[in-house]
Amino acid sequence: MESIVFNVEPRDCDKNAAKKLRDQGKVPAVVYHKGEETIHICVDERSLKKLVHSSESHLIDLTFPDGKEKRSFLKEVQFDPVTDKIIHADFQFFSAGEVLEMDVPTTFIGEGEAPGVVAGGNVQVILHSLKVKAVPSNIPQHITIDVSGMELGQTMHIREIPVETYEGKFEIISDPDSSVVSIVAPKVEAEVIESEEEEETPAVASEEE
């Protein structure tokens, strides 16, 4: 997995200071690791937003003003419920060889070859990421899932993801019964059927009269 660099700065942790940082285009954040003191920092909002909406996962080298670096990963992000802006982030340090749990984005291949798509269906992605467990060197930037064998109306669950997808390098620890992707009938067909039923209703009422 590739790493990216984030320049960070220490920050005060009172509410007024946090608001001021957000007004300056920065996001209040914390960095923690089991057995170590939590560090309060701030990061550039644009850089963090780009990372959050990336289709790949990354390790992050947090660089402090004194030149020190801490390798970490993004653990959690909080959004404003009204504006959807990022208002807080949690990063987690880790040591070499430590087993991590991370959310990794999903990508899909073989859509055009899937019998369900050939029959007119659409691919509906349900899970855009999966939680995996592994040492950092084995965590992928994304998990590629082949849907080329899926039929119309079929749903793939986590437990059905082929083992060769991850080659034993990491463990998927999300709920195995969770649905990942489905091939569904086009909505247009459903709308046409509903419209036809509505047109037939007055005719039935007329006969009863």
Swiss-Prot record:
Belongs to the bacterial ribosomal protein bL25 family. CTC subfamily. Pfam families: Ribosomal_L25p, Ribosomal_TL5_C. Keywords: Ribonucleoprotein, Ribosomal protein, RNA-binding, rRNA-binding. Part of the 50S ribosomal subunit; part of the 5S rRNA/L5/L18/L25 subcomplex. Contacts the 5S rRNA. Binds to the 5S rRNA independently of L5 and L18. Gene3D superfamilies: Ribosomal protein L25, beta domain, Ribosomal Protein L25, Chain P. The keyword Electron transport does not apply. The gene is rplY. InterPro entries: Rbsml_bL25/Gln-tRNA_synth_N (IPR020056), Ribosomal_bL25/Gln-tRNA_synth (IPR011035), Ribosomal_bL25_b-dom (IPR020057), Ribosomal_bL25_C (IPR037121), Ribosomal_bL25_long (IPR001021), Ribosomal_L25_dom (IPR029751), Ribosomal_uL5_bac-type (IPR020930). This is one of the proteins that binds to the 5S RNA in the ribosome where it forms part of the central protuberance. GO terms for biological process: translation. It comes from the Bacteria. GO terms for molecular function: 5S rRNA binding; structural constituent of ribosome. This is Large ribosomal subunit protein bL25. GO terms for cellular component: cytosolic large ribosomal subunit.
